[in-house]
Curated annotation (Swiss-Prot):
Pathway: Amino-acid biosynthesis; L-arginine biosynthesis; carbamoyl phosphate from bicarbonate: step 1/1; Pyrimidine metabolism; UMP biosynthesis via de novo pathway; (S)-dihydroorotate from bicarbonate: step 1/3
GO process annotations (BP): 'de novo' pyrimidine nucleobase biosynthetic process; 'de novo' UMP biosynthetic process; cellular response to amino acid stimulus; glutamine metabolic process; L-arginine biosynthetic process
Glutamine amidotransferase type-1 domain sequence ranges: 193-378
Family: Belongs to the CarA family.
Keyword ATP-binding applies: yes
Region ranges (CPSase): 1-189
Protein name: Carbamoyl phosphate synthase small chain
Record-linked PANTHER family: CARBAMOYL-PHOSPHATE SYNTHASE SMALL CHAIN, MULTIFUNCTIONAL TRYPTOPHAN BIOSYNTHESIS PROTEIN-RELATED
Active site: C269, H353, E355
SUPFAM superfamilies for the chain: Carbamoyl phosphate synthetase, small subunit N-terminal domain, Class I glutamine amidotransferase-like
Keywords: Amino-acid biosynthesis, Arginine biosynthesis, ATP-binding, Glutamine amidotransferase, Ligase, Nucleotide-binding, Pyrimidine biosynthesis
Gene designation: carA
Alphabetical list of Pfam families matching this protein: CPSase_sm_chain, GATase
Length: 378
């Protein structure tokens, strides 16, 4: 027997559907993602903390879920919205159906609504604060009240909420088809020591760095620069993460100290925005952000166009770039800034996700550039 669910947006829009996850309520910023695959990776991406994700592809759940595809040890998305849930999940790697996975993680979700109508609202009006109520006692009035009470992501520091509690070492590499596993690489086979700041890091980022020879020390978001420099790293990586970058004063200050050294710095997503702020630029809140796996981005140096995976609601304001920063990549959807590099230091960053998961690997060579920068410094 199905349970009813209600989705309410702060603008007053109401959608009724079927509860497919945990009972209860959830609030957050409602966004839409256009990826056709990778729903488990999306749900477990810490960058989606405090966001309710609408998946525009109509059939979600076809292949079930498996622990190997998770990007974190839990679901971080505040909720899930889909059009249609298949009756059967079929895949040789599947360990659990999507509804069972959502319930096990306490994730509230709704299916059976018009996601095309919802996406048009979000595209035209911008991301909306929203609420999903799941259960027989759900009312439109209560859902709307909770949606309008959510403060929004502007000014919200979420990196310190999703980061690791303690420092740890990481040696796991990318998935191997023959062994059906993520092999552990001996430390002796990893020539570069990289300290990775966890602002909400995805596991596939760590795996791709290991696959390129990096011995990783992952540190909490609020780790002072002095502690990192004491580890004598070959490079410093600034991870993806959720929320507004501007309140992350602790991260901005640490990055400024790193930029006083000659250690190569590479940032992704939130790390990209933090590098910009540490260099004197400013960031802004986008209308509906970029969330998907089919976003065209142009390399301004070569003219090459790459299809990229994107997940961000904030962006670096190109008009505020100081002389020590130059633009390297731009979105061909809306012209927003996608990449920067310091003109006086070996420090660069990219707004999208070179590691994909889900999505294409067109921008993966940025990892190789980071490796080359460390090799040249030796």
């Amino acid at each position: 027997m199905t349970k009813p669910a209600i989705l309410a947006l702060a603008d007053g829009s109401i959608f009724r559907g079927e509860a497919i996850g945990a009972d209860g309520q959830t609030v957050g910023e409602v966004v839409f993602n256009t990826a056709m695959t990778g729903y488990q990776e999306i749900l477990t991406d810490p960058s989606y903390a405090q966001q309710i994700v609408t998946l525009t592809y109509p059939h979600i759940g076809n292949t079930g879920t498996t622990p190997e595809d998770a990007e974190a040890n839990r679901v971080w998305a505040a909720g899930l919205i889909i059009r249609d849930l298949p009756l059967i999940a079929s895949n040789w790697r599947s360990k659990q159906s999507l509804p069972d996975y959502l319930k096990a993680n306490g994730t509230v979700a709704i299916a059976g609504i018009d996601t095309r109508r919802l996406t048009r609202i979000l595209r035209e009006k911008g991301s909306q604060n929203g609420c999903i109520l799941a259960g027989a006692d759900a009312t439109e009035e209560r859902a709307l009240e909770l949606a309008r009470a959510f403060p929004g992501l502007k000014g919200m520091d979420l990196a310190k909420e999703v980061t690791t509690a303690e420092r740890y070492e990481w040696r796991s590499s990318v998935w191997n088809l023959e062994s059906d596993s993520h092999p552990e690489i001996p430390a002796g086979e990893l020539p570069y020591h990289v300290v990775a700041y966890d602002y909400g890091v995805k596991l596939n980022i760590l795996r791709m760095l290991v696959a390129r020879g990096c011995r990783l020390t992952v540190v909490p978001a609020q780790t002072p620069a002095s502690e990192v420099l004491a580890l004598n790293p070959d490079g410093i990586f600034l991870s993806n993460g959720p929320g507004d970058p501007e309140p992350c004063d602790y991260a901005i200050q640490a990055i400024r100290e790193f930029l006083d050294t000659e250690i190569p710095v590479f940032g992704i997503c939130l790390g990209h925005q933090l590098l910009a702020l540490a260099s004197g630029a400013k960031t802004l809140k986008m209308g509906h952000g970029h969330h998907g796996a089919n976003h065209p981005v142009q390399d301004l140096d070569s003219g090459v166009v790459m299809i990229t995976s994107q997940n961000h609601g904030f962006a670096v304001d190109e008009s505020t770039l100081p002389d020590n920063l130059r633009a390297t990549h731009k979105s061909l959807f809306d012209g927003t800034l996608q990449g920067i590099e310091r003109t006086d230091k070996v420090a660069f960053s990219f707004q999208g996700h070179p590691e994909a998961s889900p999505g294409p690997h067109d921008v993966a060579p940025l990892f190789d550039r980071f490796i080359s920068a460390m090799a040249e410094r030796r």
